[in-house]
């Protein structure tokens, strides 16, 4: 079953019900309340994976410039207009020129790797030394142009990726108030869920999550200190990976915690995430955590993709899940059965009773 059919089968409805409404967040409901689902038949790259895009470029069906333009048009159609997803803060004005340069390299027989010519959106707390701002969504940093690319941006450019634009986020990556709203920033306003426009997109990588789910780019990059990749990925039915701290450089990323911060890919398939992770990993001498992890990273994470990889794995699930929605609980039971059928062992654990205490310990670390 592909991802789009999986969403239509009902699992998305479960994800949507779990997303809390935007209580306390000032946001206007757009006049056009159609979701990105309503424009499926209009977008020819819907749910295309990175390997599919590469195959299309290799065959000559599409160029990187054509693909980039299609994603830009998609952003204008449903992010800046229509349902007004509001997930992209700005589009790189040089994206098409970069794409054309990469097309020329392809014509000349120079391919940089699996990300050659692939448009990527990145979170607005990651430095780019180009014509785009880096503000963490804050008006306080409006007009800030980085003098140097973040290390992971250097890696993406070297791999042939096209930095298509910057995504909205919970301002300052949600580290500004214990009453802040997921997906809202003073610079960008409120990011919306592509599936339920009035529901919480989660955060702080809200724009990256919405943009990936709505097919506004091939893949996106988020950052996480505490749930900022995994939470928006979960409510948008994405594959979101928070790597072990140190696997990816944090240089050039607006910091919160030196013990918990990391960037990570957010995509529609495990393969796309593995391809992107492979390009991001390298030792950065300016990041002590990266130096400490030297020699521990793989060069190609796609080698670990195995449909039988769940066999023998132990997966912990909360014994007493939050909420009493019978539909959600039924979906959870189906998930357990599916994991068990794939050879995994479900281990019921109890941590919710201790979550407040654990939260206090974590907050002390963050301080």
Question: For each predicted feature, which ranges?
Answer:
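Flexible, acidic loop-helix segments that line cofactor/substrate-binding pockets
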Residues: 90, 288-294, 313-314, 349-364
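Acyltransferase
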Residues: 68-69, 100, 150, 300, ...
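Short glycine/serine-rich loop segments
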Residues: 148-280
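Short, well-ordered alpha-helical
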Residues: 9-10, 14-19, 26-142, 172-174, ...
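Active-site-proximal beta-strand/loop segments in catalytic clefts of secreted hydrolases
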Residues: 124-125, 165-169, 221-225, 318-320, ...
